[in-house]
Amino acid sequence: MSSTTTQAFSLKTRQAVDEDALLTEEDRVVKEATKGEDCTTRRRACKNCTCGRAELERKMLAEGKKVEMPQMPAGGCGNCAKGDAFRCATCPFLGQPAFDNTSDGKVKLNLTDDI
C-alpha cells in the first residue's frame, strides 16, 4: 500500500485573493431602503414627519376637530405577548417588552418579601 501525501495548504503557495473578483455586477448595485406607505402603527405623527400626517393633525386641531387616533390592530400571529423575538413584522406591540396577555391589561406586582 503506497501512500502519497499531499499538502492541502501551504503558506508558500498561498495567493492573495482579489476582493473585486468576488463581487458580481448585481452585488455592486446600490439598493435604496424603502419606507412603509403609511404610519398607522403610531399614535401620533413622527417628529420629522414627511408623509403629511403632522400637517393634517395641526389643521384638524386648528379647526377645533378632534384628532382621531388610529386603532391599534390586534396581532394576527398570536405571539404578541412573547416578545420581539417571536413577533411578526407588522405586530402593533413591536419594540415593547413581553407581557402576560391573560391579565386583562393589569400589572401584576410581586410584593412578597424575599426573607
Curated annotation (Swiss-Prot):
UniProt keyword annotations, A-Z: 2Fe-2S, 4Fe-4S, Cytoplasm, Iron, Iron-sulfur, Metal-binding, Mitochondrion
Protein name: Anamorsin homolog 1
Chain ranges for the short sequence motif Cx2C motif 1 as given in the UniProt record: 77-80
GO molecular function, one term: metal ion binding
One of the record's GO cellular component terms: mitochondrial intermembrane space
Region described as Fe-S binding site A: spans on this chain: 39-51
Major place of residence: cytoplasm
Cofactor(s) annotated in UniProt: [2Fe-2S] cluster; [4Fe-4S] cluster
Domain statement: The C-terminal domain binds 2 Fe-S clusters but is otherwise mostly in an intrinsically disordered conformation. The N-terminal domain has structural similarity with S-adenosyl-L-methionine-dependent methyltransferases, but does not bind S-adenosyl-L-methionine. It is required for correct assembly of the 2 Fe-S clusters.
Protein's UniProt keywords contain Cytoplasm: yes
Positions of [4Fe-4S] cluster binding: 77, 80, 88, 91
Residues that hold [2Fe-2S] cluster according to the record: 39, 46, 49, 51
Species name: Trypanosoma cruzi (strain CL Brener)
Domain of life: Eukaryota
Coiled coil: none
Keyword S-adenosyl-L-methionine listed: no
Compartments where located: Cytoplasm; Mitochondrion intermembrane space
Chain spans, region Disordered: 30-115
Family (UniProt): Belongs to the anamorsin family.
Residue segments, region Fe-S binding site B: 77-91
